Amino acid sequence: MASKQAKRKEVHRINSAHGSDKSKDLYHFGSNVPPGSFEQKKGKFPIWPEWSEADINAEKWDAGKGGKEKDKTAKSPIFHFFEDPEGKIELPQSLKVFSWKRPQDFIFSRTPVVVKNEITFDLFSPNEHLLCSELMRWIISEIYAVWKIFNGGILSNYHKGNLGELPILPWKPWEHIYSLCKAVKGHVPLFNSYGKYVVKLYWMGCWRKITVDDFLPFDEENNLLLPATSYEFELWPMLLSKAIIKLANVDVHVAHRRELGELTVIHALTGWLPEVIPLHPAYVDRVWELLKEILPEFKLTEEPSSESKITTIDNKLKEATKENKDGKDGKNGKDLKDGKDMKDGKDGKDGKDGKDGKDGKDEKADARDLGKKNKKDGEKEKEKFKFSLHGSRPSSDVQYSMQSLSECSSAIQLPHMVVYATFTPLYLFENKIFSLEKMANSAEKLREYGLSHICSHPVLVTRSRSCPLVSPPKPPPLPAWKLIRHKKETVITDEAQDAVPKKPEQFLEISSPFLNYRMTPFTIPTETHFVQSVIKKGTPLGSSLPPLVENDLVASTSQGEMSIVNGNQSQGNIALQITLGKDEPSEPALADFHQLEATSLDRDLISLTTATLDKSQEELAINEGVAKEIWLDFEDFCVCFHHIYIFHKPHSYCLNFQKSEFKFVEERVPYYLFVDSLKPIELLVCFSALVRWGESGALTKDSPPVEPGLLTAEAITWKSLKPLSVVLRIHTYATKASVVRLPAGRHMLLFNAYSPVGHAIHVCSMTTFVIGDEDIVLPNFEPESYRFTEQSIIIMKAIGNVIANFKDKGKLPAALRDLQAAHYPIPLNNKELTAQHFRVFHISLWRLMKKSQVAKPPSNFKFAFRAMVFDTDLLDSFSEDVSLAEWVDLKYSTPINEKEYTSEEIAAAVKIQSMWKGCYVRLLMKARKPETKENVTVADTLQKIWAVLEMNLEQYALSLLRLMFKSKCKSMESYPCYQDEETKLAFADHTVNYADQPPNSWFIVFREIFLVPQDMIILPKVYTTLPICILHVINNDTLEQVPKVFQKVVPFLYTKNKKGYTFVAEAYTGDTFVSGARWKLRLIGSYNPLPFLARDSPCNTFSIKEIRDYYIPNDRKILFRYSIKVTVAQSITIQVRTSKPDTFIKLQVLESEEVITSTVGKGQAVIPAFYFLGNEKALSSQSSKQVLLSHPSPKKDPEVLTKKKSGQPGQKSFKGRSGGGLTDTGMPLLEEEILNIPTLEENSSTPQQCYKYIIQCLVLFNSWPLNETQLTFVQALKDMEKMDIKEKHEEPAPMGSPDSHAVSEGQKSVGVPKTTRKGKEKSAEKEKLAKEKQAPRFEPQQVQMPTAVHSQQEDPNKPYWILRLVSEHTDSDYVDVKKDTERADEIRAMKQAWETTEPGRAIKAAQARLKYLTQFIKKPVTTDTTTSAPSPETLSVSQSQTKSSEEGELDTGKYADIKELPPNAAGSVLWKKWQMTKTITSLTKFTSSESVPKEEPPQKEIPVVRQRSPTILETSPQQIRKALEFLDFSHYVRKTAAEAVLQTEELNKQQAMQKAEEIHQFRQHRSRILSIRDIDQEERFKQKDEVLEMYGEMRDSVDEARQKILDIREVYRNKLLEAERLRMEALAAQEAAVKIEIEKKSPASDSQKKKKVGKKK
């Protein structure tokens, strides 16, 4: 059963994993084996399998039972213990292994156990000899951190309550170990005497099963080199550490600098994802805000109790006493329990007792933090690991509770996070001076807080604080009488009073077991600050005068050993005094009072806490472990640490995606991601990379470079090949995570993962996302985005609100305003654009309403709509047939008047129209006014329309907004959802199947015409397993190809055309056999409808016609010319390939010798599709094809039509002809042509257009030179072809053109002449020879191929080429391809006609040529009587015939395929010709070297050989050589000197040096001229800039002067206005005074009058 489970589990492994035969390790059995004995490490081993509880339950833990252990321990079956098949672990270099022992070899007191104490453990005190190793410090620190995170609060409550029952701990480190137990919750591993243990750790994206043995390393002093607890017989730390070290050995790090790379033990123990954030001085403020969000925050209560103060001081005093007492830091941190009371009194944080109680020590650090304001340096080398389990928990909950960790309440709770921080060791051999500076600053600051830079280790960041630890005492209330007209104190001084900025309270609490380890913290005074002191100068005691407040310059004197009480008190006083001195007016006497009061209070507290110093350390450190806490100023925190890590719990996120791949290939794996949200998006992306396997993790100088794994994320859009932005880039050797933050909306991301061995990707988010292959993700981009849907529904609901309140007088104006705000959210500040926007909205709404009315709309439908939108001209100026986008672009155009009207008529028409329009507008206004009859009618009509729309509100809303977006109005860009249009897409797939293909074959996979219904951007993508597949897209109207980048078609704007676009896919199999499979073309566009096929289904059966021949160089550089005629119009693909892969060729299609289309290629050239118009016969049965031929005859029309039909695949199955199938000369063809002449004449009488197409290929840039072997082969090939042609055309009868289309094109037609008797007698022999030599060896071959199977083996040493014509299988019978020999046949027939009409013409021409040559030929002088020079007659005749032959051949040199040979081709003729070839070639080289300074290329030699006449070949080569020796070339030689000089090597060198000197002088002169030009240009630019600057300064000066004048004017004006105002006020006051005086006088006078009257009475 175990073996079956092992085989089943092996699915997750990689059998081809890398491994290395590591060096032998020390293997010591107690004292029985000498230290020098070694054991070879095991070889390759598979990657650790994924965790499976079924495998653990079926595991065999003893020896020899089951095949699993036998396979793994195949080394020595005689041992009765388990030995790790992966070999011994590799310890860091700081730990020297001397021997390996099993637990039975060094534990004698009792039987070893895996777990002894399940409540507490001590990994610090027993392992001080291991703390020199960075790896061991990390393991110990991170085990403590995870223990504190999960179990800190539970154990604190347990020890405080002294409960009898043991608490249930959420996490136990020994539960990662399995031995002799089942995989159940809460299992306890047992000691296994066999030595086999299984450890469960998280690695490469999942939990892994890691098997270890119980061999433990020891050094020479017999010290265990793995962490252990205080119980020496407890094994779980050693076993767990061995598995962790296995993971560390896979990681990559630099030897002699670090002992571990990017591995994090917390990630291995918990599976949480580490996010790396470097601390850079530029954005430390953002880091503080992030930490404040994540970490629990320490807060002060309004009234802290005195009991909490006493308890806090108690703990701090004890801590300080213990630190001075002994250096055993392992026990110093265990006295943190009683400090919980202070926390309870301050925060009311229930679950954080254990953590808050540690504030006693942290307050001590706080006193030191107060006076430190160090500058922040750039930090990059230290790593910070942040564990903030608290992302969404309330700030009152300070303790990490497992309950909050384990719960993931969907979208209500935010993810849990934990903050961690580390610093790297001090490396003195660092080459970068900036790194050394950072290390020095960090080491100095760490020492102030009791940490050592040498002992690098991770620290846990637990809390943040933005307030003092102890709340300052409140000032006594001021008496009410002092609050009346309270004046600020006046300070008499002549110095400027500068406000001292107050440093913000920013502190972080860290927890570390290495705090104050073997060192005493101290503070280095680096800055000064002002401390206010109250000094009464010149005043006697008891004086009531206010004292003077001065600032004395005092250095920071707070010491690390200072009591935390004094530190807190001084901190509180300073903060209070600064506040009072700067902001609040207060009397100095109050400050004195507060200071004295605080001092007396502190003395009382100290006296109260001294009694607690006698308590034992055990009572104060109940199960708090060795971890201690301290508060750090955030500014100092940024100096000490360079990176922070935030560990995210993945299960606290709503959505998780995980994918792992192990492939030993260096290729990037793409992942597409879709996300859409109405709120900002956060994606947590974790990437794990395995860059190598089975090798040591340390990198030395001799190690090969190892590239890290790479994960990139790009925001892409299918409309562009360039990504919009790179949003993420992760380089790692182990595991790293990062948060991708995206704005609200829809996004398309492309992840590319690269790792040599394997990788794992993990994506978490609280927002819904889809990630995977393109087929999985693309369908999510078809629906409208969330923002688009929301915007459309808002608009539609606003329309419904208007319709519902159309009869309500009070609500209708508000509803109309809401509708305008919905569809016109942002003012455009452009009247024309705003008017266009409203018109677009009204037309879109009209189209939607009209479309929604399935039944007959109401009679007043249009009137009701106009009343609602209040637009009378809209529907009249808009045509229903015109698209909205076209209507937007159109401007109002004046109508064309067919006749001219008089001014009176125009005025009358305008008056009538204005009257009717005014009446209609008044009617609309009345309909919009509630409580009118018209309004009720319109409202009822609108209600009926809305009832239809409301049934499918969302669909109609999307249609409305989509209509508006299709208008392409610029105002649509103001909508927020417009940004989502970049990712809006629709796609359609078209698939075909292809058959099996042999190696090195080319074939067509797909060829179809697509019709584009509307202008849109389209991206075609090909999905296939073919090694090479290229897609071509051709516009059938213009015959232009859509541009490609790296052989891929780019997104392109496809405009609507008449003949559509042809999509052609060509493929090449390469060196391997390709089996048949499915090929898919995907068209991606913005919206439907997408381009569609011109027929129902695509064609996948094609016929390939192959033509092979050899390259024969010629003067015109023509590779070949073939004429092609099609009976039925069809599309054909043309491909040419050459044997020389770097030859530049140009493939052309000619119609009537005019280039219709062409393409240039290197080694091959392809015309993807060309539509050939057919010459259909009168009795053609292809009636369906005749429709396609009914096109006009002008030349341009066939050209355009060619492109349209090229999309329809046309295949051809040719009738293969053996031998001379491509040679269209000979008697059989002539006879057939003679029989067909009457038919052609009948056809020519019809008005049908006859199309003549030529396929021509040219060699460019002389890019196909031939070597000697190839030249010899080509020469022999030409000679044999000449013999064949001579045999076929030996008779003097004239020959007409073998091609029937030559007659139909109107060229000169040659009749059949009367043949001579000799020709008639030799006709029978000719037919016989034609049958015998039907297929010469070097004859080009024409092969009909259903597929691209080669008919003969290709010889790469011969210059051959292949022409392929691909048509649809059904149309292949209607294609005829022939070699184009029309011009050669015409020349040959012309010569024959001349000879027939004028006999002896050839002889006369030969005599004339002889006469010309005799002028330059001298008779050779020779004494040899046996050998005589040729007679003049013989030589003249031969040379005249040679000249005649050359004249004819020069005319035909354009067509190198037509050649002539002598009539008597005997067996020895070929040998003679080969000899003559060598002779004339050497002669040509010699002659050209003397006459022409530049030697002609080898291609020029070949026509000379071909132009020799048969008469010369019959002459002896010696005679020709002697005759040519006496040729007079003197008049061809150009003399440049008076006397001839011998051309020697010295002369050549001298001339070369002169030439080089001239070139050098010219180059110097040229460079001088160019430099002068550059200088002049720079001066001109400089002068131009100076002129612009001068005018700019003049403008600025004028503006400044104008502004000064205006300012002076304004001041003067204000002064006058002020004076006028004062004068008016004075006058008003004067008048008021006068009036008062008058009023005072008038009552007095009245009273006096009354008194007088009374007296009179």
Curated annotation (Swiss-Prot):
Where is it localised?
A: Cell projection, Cilium, Flagellum
What biological function has been recorded for the protein in this entry? Probable chimeric globin with a bis-histidyl six-coordinate heme-iron atom through which it could bind dioxygen, carbon monoxide and nitric oxide. Required for sperm flagellum formation and maturation of elongating spermatids, thus playing an essential role in male fertility.
Q: Domain description from the entry?
A: The globin domain is circularly permuted. The globin domain, which normally consists of eight consecutive alpha-helices from A (N-terminal) to H (C-terminal), is circularly permutated and split into two parts. The part containing helices A and B is shifted C-terminally and is separated from the main globin sequence (helices C-H) by a potential calmodulin-binding IQ domain.
- UniProt protein name: Androglobin
Q: How does it assemble?
A: Interacts with septin SEPT10; contributes to in vitro proteolytic cleavage of SEPT10 in a calmodulin-dependent manner. Interacts with CFAP69. Interacts with SPEF2. May interact with calmodulin.
**PROSITE patterns, sorted:** CALPAIN_CAT, GLOBIN_CP_ADGB, IQ
Which residue windows are coiled coil?
A: 1585-1640
Q: Which GO terms describe its biological process?
A: proteolysis; spermatid development; spermatogenesis
Tissues expressing the protein:
Strongly expressed in testis and lung. Weakly expressed in heart, brain, spleen, kidney and tongue.
Per the similarity annotation, which family is this? In the central section; belongs to the globin family. In the N-terminal section; belongs to the peptidase C2 family.
Q: What's the encoding gene here? A: Adgb
Q: Where does the Calpain catalytic domain start and stop, copy by copy?
A: 70-402
Globin domain residues are 762-889, 935-967
**How is loss of this gene reflected in the phenotype of the organism?**
Adgb knockout males display infertility, reduced testis weight, impaired maturation of elongating spermatids, abnormal sperm shape and ultrastructural defects in microtubule and mitochondrial organization. Females display no fertility issues. Epididymal sperm display multiple flagellar malformations including coiled, bifid or shortened flagella, and erratic acrosomal development. The spermatids are not able to move to the lumen and enter the epididymis to undergo further maturation. A high rate of apoptotic events might further aggravate the decrease of sperm.
